[in-house]
Each structure stands twice: as structure tokens, then as C-alpha cells.
Amino acid sequence: MKIVEFFGIFKKKIYHNGDFIVAIFYDPVTSKQFKVTGTNVPMEKNVKYHLLGELTSYKKTGEQTLQLIDYEITDLDEESSFIEYLAMPPIKLNRLQGKKIYKLFNKRAIDILDNDPQQIYDTIFKSLKNGDERYNKFIGEWKRQRKLLKTTSFLVRYGISRKNIMKLNEAVSVEQYEDLGAAIKDNPYFIMNVSGVHVDINVCDEIAKKLHYPKNSPERIKAGMKYVLRNAMTNGHMFLYCYGADGLIAAVMQTLSVSAAEVATVLNTRPKGFIIEHDKKRKNYRIYLDYAHEWEVGLARKIYEYLSQKVRKVMDKNEVEKFLQDYQHKNGITLAEKQQEAVYAVAENPITIITGGAGTGKTTSLNAILAMLDASGNDKNCLLASTGKASQRMIEATGRVATTIHRCIACDDGNEDKMSYEKGITCDALIIDEFSMTDCKVAYLLFCAIISCKRIIIVGDVEQLPSVGAGNVLKDLIQSGRICVVTLNVIQRQALDSPIVANAQKILREESDFVFNDNFRFIETQNGEEAATYIVNRYMDLTQEHGISAVQILSPMKKRICGTIQLNEMIQNQLFPSLHNDKFRIGDKVINTKNK
């Protein structure tokens, strides 16, 4: 990688996605503009920057872009840069006062601020109202920023964004360090302890190596434990067991190249930030990050408290029976036995879980339950789902207002160990659909947000993929044995003789004795090319018979001959053949990305 340098002044931001920014700078001498990208792009105007980075060329246009590695403010001895630097947060000195300082000391102003700030007090602040207080605040912030400038220049070279550096700097006072530089020098793995800062442990190791920090230090091992547990949580695990091939000790040993004894020694100190629980049944220990333990235990406690409350029945059994007779007659339907059982369960229990596979009638049951709640006067209901798509399907299926959990309680779960919600829930019944996609953290926030609610109805398919976040909440609630569960097991959506659902259930049970007929077939081919040709030809036949919107092709991959890219290209050539080697075909969706 060849490092190049530019001098430039920020002009405008043209794109951002999270920390990543694309901005336009211009050379103050030639006025030539150039593009800068990165996670630490400075955006203060009228300040001259010394920019270091890698120059890359965009393949299609040949346009060159500077991928920023580091920068520093230069020419602070020039009036405009000096005034703007003092006006930037967190110093925030009035521009008129900054201009006055520069007029008095000219190019010596920086040296005076660093080495003889008393002159600044005597000439600027002494005569001002509350001058002593304003001076102490200003000069204190100046000194902190000068120290931070050196530390920032050091850290950005390791790929740590300015945004993360600001978070680290805010955490310094909490950890009782004098400044960020002192914190990093004392413990390079301090970075791993700060909420919302996601840095790979290898980066901390590089910094530690530069500072000659010992490889087997307790702080490094604690950081390694945290790193391993965070990765485990991204894979859905709330905790790891201490011992075993997949245990925490083994994972930390592999990640850090340390011994089991060294990891065990740190664990025996019961380090801050971790919760260790003895699992007598497995003769092992569960190791949690403290905030993950709070979610799990807190959620269990909330549910226990809710189950312990005395809740009046919506209707007694006779009233439910009468309601079901009227409801089925009015709507011209017949509810299956388990669907009726779900209605009875909701009438009697504070929390009910309704589960079942695709096509078993969960939505039909939910509509009957909502009608029963309306008939009993419990019509102030809150309908939620885990995702936007799920809430939209809920609206279409019930004809009622529904929204996502996040939007309902206005929760912020951006940082892994910090969370908040702004809105409480008050309703007669809370109905949560697609609950299998709700992780432990969001479920905990949801139950914390409940102010008043007579009933909770949880709907979901336990066989679906679990949530992206940590925890398998729906499955755990069902297996707890403390909550009323109704499992719908009669397929309503498919024909009785269709093997599709039956074979899907066999797959879930890891069985392979599938039932084949015209609705479920296995076609054997000699190679991928033959398979792709068969798929495309069959697709063309079916679309002519049923229409394009009625036929779908699913492929487990993007690339290769039977991947989605190749299959889509083959189908496009069949449906809309190119007449003149045209790039676009009839029906293609086009978006204009540049105005010229």
C-alpha cells in the first residue's frame, strides 16, 4: 500500500452511511477539488488539513479517491485556521475572542497558549464578566484537546475512527484516568471496555505491542474473554460454558495463544463485567457478559411477575363456547380443535403462546381471539411484530393497526450493553406476532415498557430460524413449562394430500424418506449445466401456463451455473432476448445515479 499526502480544505459532504463518509475537499493553492472517503473524515470548514491515505481509482470512470488513514490540522499559525480551530467543539471559543487573541499574538498565539497562557488571561479574560471561570474552562479544554490530538493521531493509524476515539475520550473520566493517552498507556485493552466501541482485539494487540505491554497480562485475557463472548452473542448465544471444546477457556486460548491456566487464573478473580454461574447439572460454569445476564434474568423476572398477577377471565367457558358458535356461523368458517383451544386459553390466562408451523392457522386463530376481546369490551389492543414486513402482514391479515416493537416503544438498542425506551405500553391485550425473531434484549425492553396490560398473546413458529440477536426467547418460554402453550398442528393452507408440508416437517426432524408425487418431485441431472437448462425450460413452461408472478425459483447460492445470477441471466435471455446487444431490456428497473 502506497501512502500519499494531500493538503486540503473541506468543502461538502456528498454521502454517508454510519461512520463512513464521502466528502469533497479542495486544494487551497490550486483550488482543484478531490474526493476523500473513510470513517474519520474531518468536516470543519475554513481549516487546512494535512491528509494521509491511499489513492485508489474508480474502475468505471477512472476517478481518483483518497482513502483516508489519518489527518491533522495544519497551519494553525494562520489566522483563519486558528480562529476556526478554537471555535470547534469542545473548545467553542467565541470567534471574536479567537480573532482578538490572534491579533495580539499573531503567529506566536499557539506557543503562548501552550507555554504561557497567563498572557491570554491578562489580555483577554481578566476584564470579562466571570472571566476567571471562563478562562479556566477555555484553557482546560485547550490542554485536553492538545493531548487528545497526539493520542488521536496515534490511534487512527490503527483504523480506529474519530467517532470511536471521541467515545473513548468521554469514557476516560469514568475510568478515572487523567486523559485518553494515559488510559491507553496504562491499559491498551481499555478500548474493549467502552460501550459502543467495536474494535477487533488484534488492533488492541498491535497497540499493546507498540507499548511493550505483556501478552499474558490479566487485562489482555479479560479483553479476550469479552471479545470471544461478544462473537458468541453475534451467533445467538447468551453465554458460553467455561469448559469443553467449545467452551470459553478453549476459545480464549485459541484467540490469544495463552494457556488454560492463565485464563483460569483470571476467571478465578471474578473479573468485573462478567457473571459466572455454576451449572450443577452439567458440572460446568456459565460465563455471561454482565449486560447479557441482566437481559436474561430481567426478562425472566418480568414474566414471573406478570404470571403472578391475578387476572380476571375475559369470558367463562360457556361464554367462549357461545362466542365461537356465533363467530364461526357469522364468518362461514369452522375452526379446528386447536384453534378453538387457543381462544379458550387467551380468555383464561395472563400470557398465552400460540405456535405452529406455516399454514396451521395462526392468523385465523388470532382474528378469532381479537373478535372475542372486542366482544368482551377488551378492545384497546396493541398489535406488534418483530420486523416491518411482519407488521405489514399483520395489518393485512387483521385489518387493524400494527407496528414494530422498536417503533412502539421507541427503543434504542444500538449499543450492546446500553439500552433505553421512550414510550410505555398501556392496553387491554398485547399481541406480538413472529416472536421467534425477537431476541432477548428486545424482549426484555418490551416487557420493561409495559405499564398496564391485562393479557399478552405471543404468536410464532418455534421451528423458524431464531432471532439475529442473542437468545432463543420463544423456544425458552415454551420449554419453561410456566406459560400456557397452544400448538396448532393441523395444516390448513395446503391440500390434505399435498406432501409439501409433510416433507418440510420431515426435514425439520432430519428425516429423508420423502413422499414424492406431481407436487413434490426430485429431478436428477448429470451436471450443473443440465440442471440449469432444465430449470429455465421448466420455468418458461410454467410461466406460460400460470403467469410470471405465480412461479418462483429458489437457489441456495448466487454464483456458479445454478446460482441466482446465472439463472436470472438465462431467464432474461429467454423472456426478453437482446436485439442489438442492448444492456437494458423491456421491464428492467432503472435508477439515475448522477445528474450531469
Predicted regions: what they are:
Residues 1-17, 53:
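Structural detector for short beta-strands of small beta-barrel domains
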Residues 213, 231-234, 244-258, 329-331:
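Short helix-coil junctions and helix-kink-helix linkers
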Residues 218-241:
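Positively charged, polyanion-binding regions of nucleic-acid-associated proteins
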Residues 239, 340-343, 347-517:
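ASCE P-loop NTPase helicase motor core
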Residues 320-350:
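Conserved pre-motif I regulatory segment
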Residues 462-596:
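Conserved helicase motor core of P-loop NTPases
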